Amino acid sequence: MATSADRASRLRQALKTLLGDYQRQVDALLPLRQLVKGSVYDLRTRCGKPSCHCAADQGPLHTSTVISWSEHGKTRLRTLPPGELSHFRQLAENYRRFRQARAALVKLHQRIVAHIDRLETVLELPPPKPASRRRKG
């Protein structure tokens, strides 16, 4: 059976490992300088002109690259000019990486707090017993 000193030692080691993981996630966030919330993708649509090639059932559709994001509960789209595609793709990817690192940090933080609580339980001693009183008599 493990002693409380053994359990405390294992908890300290686990905490150090978790703190290292936490630091790696923070390090993943720090280089990101600009973010754009949203997704960049190609949107294929029909223009509505009856004589256009897109009017046929199997005809090719018009393609434009857009960025999509949610604002006040509504999905917004904005067409991106060809010169800005790679820039906005990178900014959207930065946002995705930022959010993933943030989510990992939240989970790690919960695990760290749980380990600290367990360590406290292992280290805590009971209060001293009351001094014995001798009756004179």
Stretches with model-predicted labels:
Residues 1-137:
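A positively charged, amphipathic N-terminal helix/segment that binds anionic biomolecules
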